[in-house]
Design a protein with these regions (language model features):
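Bacterial N-terminal signal peptides that target proteins for export
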Residues: 1-7
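Hydrophobic h-region of N-terminal signal peptides that target proteins for export
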Residues: 9-20
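Sequence/structural segment immediately N-terminal to covalent heme-attachment motifs in c-type
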Residues: 21-40, 103, 107-130, 145
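Gly/Gly-Pro-rich "capping" loops immediately C-terminal to redox-active cysteine motifs
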Residues: 23, 27, 41-72, 77-83, ...
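Conserved hydrophobic/aromatic "anchor" residues
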Residues: 66, 94-95, 119, 156, ...
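C-terminal capping alpha-helices of c-type cytochrome domains
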Residues: 81-103, 147, 173-191
């Protein structure tokens, strides 16, 4: 009960602190993101995440973490340095409003079945929700690029990525390389 109250309080505080939605301003600002993240946040390059359909809170917090150095990705540095808080919210509102497009990735059915089983064993839907659509600061991982999912899980496991309050790090440490590969196949095949 306490955890639910804390999550609701955090979401309410975030909503109160957010400026008014300006998807049009976000669309204009997102022009700088197209080369890597694709039109409307639907990246066609598997090493870059699909931003379309992510939650506003998740996109904003990731941009803030990149800007403040809590999350590191050299390719993002030049883009986030000049972003204001308002810019980050505009981008977050824009990407959250976009429709996710399927990728051409074809998951291996055997690996995807093992990935489903592993996701149930590790209780992934406790945070990412049923359908893996994400919530609040938890990302949508359904339909995300296989390569990106695998890299992020490995980065959490090896502590290259730590901007998650330890939740994903704790889970990823329990995963074998095969588990990570299987989860990548499973998640990339969801829409």
């Amino acid at each position: 009960m306490q955890l639910r109250f804390t999550a609701l309080a955090a979401a309410a505080a975030f909503a109160a602190a957010a400026p008014a939605q300006d998807v049009a301003a976000g669309r204009k600002k997102a022009e700088a993101c197209v080369a890597c993240h694709g039109p409307n946040g639907n990246s066609t390059q598997p090493q870059f995440p699909i931003l379309a359909g992510q939650t506003t809170r998740y996109v904003y917090l990731q941009l803030r973490d990149f800007k403040e150095g809590r999350r590191k990705e050299p390719q993002m540095d030049p883009f986030v340095k000049a972003l204001s808080r308002e810019d980050m919210f505009d981008l977050a509102f824009f990407f959250a409003a976009q429709k996710v497009r399927p990728t051409p990735f074809k998951p291996d059915p055997v690996k995807a079945a093992r990935g489903l089983k592993k996701s149930e064993e590790t209780l992934c839907t406790m945070c990412h929700l049923g359908g893996f659509l994400g919530q609040n600061e938890i990302p949508r991982v359904a339909g995300q690029h296989y390569e990106y999912v695998v890299k992020q899980l490995k980065d959490f496991k090896t502590l290259k990525r730590t901007n998650d309050a330890g939740n994903m790090t704790a889970v990823a440490k329990t995963l074998s390389d095969r588990d990570i590969d299987d989860l990548g196949h499973y998640l990339a095949g969801l829409y």
